[in-house]
Amino acid sequence: MLKFTSEHEWLQIEGDIATVGITAHAAEQLGDLVFVELPEVGATFAKDGQAATVESVKAASDVYCPLDGEVTEINQAIVDDPSLVNSDPRGAGWFFKLKLANPADAEGLLNEAAYNELIA
């Protein structure tokens, strides 16, 4: 199940695990990323808690946790090469995997059509 937030994050949800990243729209708005800071594996976040930070040549921005959960994996590749977020935001540029505290909460997030309306 693919979901989106109004803060320009995407979630690919399989069971109770969500892979989280920023959308192509967010990556375009930020410009070329030069730095990514990810949370620690095992860190727990409440919905909308600051989970990661990205910096581009234009700006720094926080990435928020889209739902309550615990980080189970991070994508070290984007720390080593932040440009992956720009070149493949919904593929190789994912940020972290989150074990959802309550997977049903994802129903309250945006579907792709609603997100596309938001950014139109």
Curated annotation (Swiss-Prot):
Recorded superkingdom: Bacteria
The UniProt record lists the keyword Cell cycle: no
Domain Lipoyl-binding: 17-99
Cofactor note (record): Binds 1 lipoyl cofactor covalently.
Gene Ontology process terms (BP): glycine decarboxylation via glycine cleavage system
Cellular component aspect of the GO annotation: cytoplasm; glycine cleavage complex
Keywords: Lipoyl
TM segment ranges: none
Cross-referenced PROSITE patterns: BIOTINYL_LIPOYL (PS50968), LIPOYL (PS00189)
InterPro entries reported for this sequence: 2-oxoA_DH_lipoyl-BS, Biotin_lipoyl, GCV_H, GCV_H/Fam206, GCV_H_sub, Single_hybrid_motif
Known cofactor(s): (R)-lipoate
List of residues that carry N6-lipoyllysine: 58
Family statement drawn from the similarity comment of this UniProt entry: Belongs to the GcvH family.
Function summary: The glycine cleavage system catalyzes the degradation of glycine. The H protein shuttles the methylamine group of glycine from the P protein to the T protein.
PANTHER family linked: GLYCINE CLEAVAGE SYSTEM H PROTEIN (PTHR11715), GLYCINE CLEAVAGE SYSTEM H PROTEIN-RELATED (PTHR11715:SF3)
NCBIfam families, per database record: gcvH (TIGR00527), PRK01202.1 (NF002270)
Subunit structure: The glycine cleavage system is composed of four proteins: P, T, L and H.
Name the record gives this protein: Glycine cleavage system H protein
